[in-house]
Amino acid sequence: MKKLAILLTLALCAALSGCGRPAPSLGGGAPVPQEPAGSVASSGEPDDPAPPAGGQTATLYIGTKAKGFAEYPMTYQGELTPEALIQGIADLTGWDLTLAGEVVSGKGGMSVCLSNKSALFTGPPEPQKEEFFVFGLDDLAETLLDSIQKTLQEGFTLEGGDPDALDIWYSVEGERPLELPGLGLSWPIDQPYQWESAVITG
């Protein structure tokens, strides 16, 4: 019995001495992969994408001076140009707004030269976009010309200025006055455009 007590005492001492040993270093073990701080697992549909870096917004105006205009946003990169606004109207409406040259800007106004390939001479696209449906050449011509005029005036008038003070002149290829034989109307090349100032030629 005395021997058994001695053996139990020795075993207890050995166990206690083992508990005092330093823990083995974890430095040599394989690293445990962890999620990067702040990362979140993707699930479901992504949120609406942010606008392109450096993108800016301009406004397109579609309609007529007589009936009013609807406004549509257009995103663009870099410097805003008259050609970019006119192309924006074309992309939005489906109308062919091919130009015969660059828009010429001068003191107090801009000169827009339309190509013979433009919708003003070839008609609206087929099929037309329902939102921009026009009835006949007269409706198309007034809407097209007024929309370009209004969009350029609003786009290039400084804050606090009067958009109507920015005159817009129209001409066609060959630096000829704008004339629409199908409607019997023309506009003098040396006078700013106003739909109601058309000269009746037919």
Residue ranges, per PLM feature:
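Bimodal "functional hotspot" detector
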Residues: 5-8, 18-202
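Bacterial Sec-type N-terminal signal peptides, specifically the leucine/valine-rich hydrophobic h-region
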Residues: 13-16
